[in-house]
């Protein structure tokens, strides 16, 4: 947003530790909605997506309740399938520590919409604790656990410190079974956990990675997750070179589009159930060509 250019909010700039990281900037919890509603959106990556900056300053922020209203009026997709909502819960442990229980707030906001639109709500988070809390509150949704390629979930680190189970520990066959037994419906993972530039151990006996051509290799994660009864999603499909593995880059300019078609296709051919893409039109183009 343009908050850094707003002198009336200059004194709100501060430094906080959130999920083990010290961050300096402006934080939503220090603003009222009336104040936030005066801000205007900006392109997050202007050096990469300069064309998008022409929209800077034109549009206000959208609240969740406003988005729910838009979805209630949205026409079905061309396939006839109603548009679904994926709500990602961020930094739940941190917000709970400052008296903002996101499970309570989200359940109050989402429950009426979810009840009126069955089967259209997906809730995801990097912290399993808040997913369980929302389940206990009876929010009807598909629950998806987000997993990074490294590190450990913030809720478990807050509870167990260095003994916290890592994301990798959740992705073992036993870990996937535990997630399903806990009521998790699916996992959503970094693309690098599904496809990447072929590592040295590709195709070796016992390796989780197998060559798929083009200098890329795919893991066995989708098959193992499906065997455990979990859906599989990945994030984020982007066409620019800086976001592509080396075999799919074209030229040396990070902002230029590389061989995104091969990259998107390689991910989709793993058999996963859905993708998150910054350019949905490009993702649909690749899906149609499979």
What are these regions (language model features)?
Residues 1-151, 155, 161-165, 175-176, ...:
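Metal-dependent phosphodiesterase/phospholipase catalytic core, i.e.
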Residues 96, 137, 142-290:
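C-terminal active-site rim and adjoining tail of enzyme catalytic domains
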């Amino acid at each position: 947003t343009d908050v850094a250019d707003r002198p009336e909010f200059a004194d709100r700039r501060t430094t906080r530790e959130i999920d083990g990281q010290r961050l300096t900037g402006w934080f939503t919890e220090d603003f009222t909605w009336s104040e936030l509603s005066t801000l205007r959106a900006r392109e997050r990556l202007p050096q990469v997506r300069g064309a998008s900056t022409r929209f800077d300053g034109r549009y206000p922020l959208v609240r969740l309740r406003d988005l729910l209203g838009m979805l209630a009026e949205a026409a079905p997709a061309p396939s006839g399938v109603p548009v679904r909502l994926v709500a990602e819960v961020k930094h739940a442990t941190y917000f709970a520590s400052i008296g903002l229980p996101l499970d309570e707030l989200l359940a109050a906001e989402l429950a009426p919409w979810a009840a009126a639109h069955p089967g259209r709500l997906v809730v995801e988070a990097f912290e399993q604790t808040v997913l369980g809390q929302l389940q206990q509150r009876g929010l009807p949704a598909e629950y998806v656990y987000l997993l990074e390629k490294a590190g450990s979930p913030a809720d478990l680190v807050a509870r167990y410190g260095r003994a916290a189970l890592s994301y990798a520990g959740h992705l073992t066959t036993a870990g996937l079974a535990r997630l399903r037994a806990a009521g998790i419906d699916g996992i959503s993972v970094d693309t690098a956990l599904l496809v990447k530039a072929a590592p040295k151990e590709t195709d070796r006996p016992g390796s989780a990675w197998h060559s798929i051509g083009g200098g890329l290799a795919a893991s066995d994660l989708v098959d193992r997750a499906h065997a455990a009864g979990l859906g599989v999603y990945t994030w984020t499909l982007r066409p620019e070179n800086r976001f592509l593995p080396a075999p799919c880059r074209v030229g040396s300019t990070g902002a230029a589009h590389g061989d995104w078609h091969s990259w998107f296709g390689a991910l989709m051919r793993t058999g996963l159930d859905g993708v998150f893409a910054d350019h949905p039109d490009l993702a649909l183009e690749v899906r149609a060509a499979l």
